[in-house]
């Protein structure tokens, strides 16, 4: 990898199986681990996420929760809100903006996620949430957010710093779930499953890079479109973000069934330059699966390649982490083939420098 050791991104290694068929190809994850095994394993074990100040709500339970964050820090909120949609007793909303909803108040739990601690949108949203009376917990490696926690006595989870935020997903996501579990918004079963997920990913690692390259063969040089069931949108966003940042690709994502009411019409101009990656899980709605099958025929009629990607594992949590790994490694393999540094984010750096000149 250009620019140094790819382990700086601490990515998981992916494997999956290619079905020998000309119809939509199915990729099922089988083995997965990451180079920094001990770091990932520690990050996925409950109560071992990072250095955490006591998080005790003393019986208080929020009526709603906001997870404030952007990019690699904010993806944990997008995924947690979807993963817990059918399990949390109150709404959990991912908030990726400078502002917060008007309903934010003293019954709101605001979880501020900023890896650097200096993300301006997150800090602005946090200020608005505090003024509205929200109760705050922070997840950060330090920076201004860490200073605010020290100043105001807010509980926080301090995660290791010095790496790209997207590479610290294991720490950030499990920290978010740790906070939500403490607030009684994340069920014990999901929370405890992280430990077995770590063991599963470490134990299953044969043929991983070879399999990742097989998927890259199918998408290299193509315009990538990502689709999933709406319940898996957080996962699909993670794939898009990793392809954007690591592989420097423009790609899009949409979800079923909503795309059936708009984007599907746009497929009248689809062609062989497109490749469709459809993420499927056993948890998908049965009617959504039917919609996917019909739409795959439409995509193929327009000349697009269609690949169905499935996760490996005996439960939803294992399959989820497996699919995260598939997307992460796909982005790194594509970056390597293109001679790109997956860590480099020149356009984002340019934007930040320009914004720093304007109060």
Task: Provide a role label for each language-model segment.
Residues 94-96, 249-260, 305-314:
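A generic structural motif
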Residues 265, 272-346:
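C-terminal active-site/capping subdomain that shapes the small-molecule cofactor and substrate pocket
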Residues 13-14, 56-202, 279-286, 290-307:
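Glycine-rich phosphate-binding loops that contact phosphosugars or nucleotide phosphates
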Residues 23-38, 45-55, 60-63, 179-275, ...:
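Active-site phosphate/pyrophosphate-binding segments
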Residues 343-359:
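Short, small/acidic-rich helices and loops at N termini and domain boundaries
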Residues 1-9:
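Extreme N-terminal basic, low-complexity initiation segments
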Residues 9, 17-18:
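Leucine-biased recognition of intrinsically disordered, low-complexity hydrophobic segments
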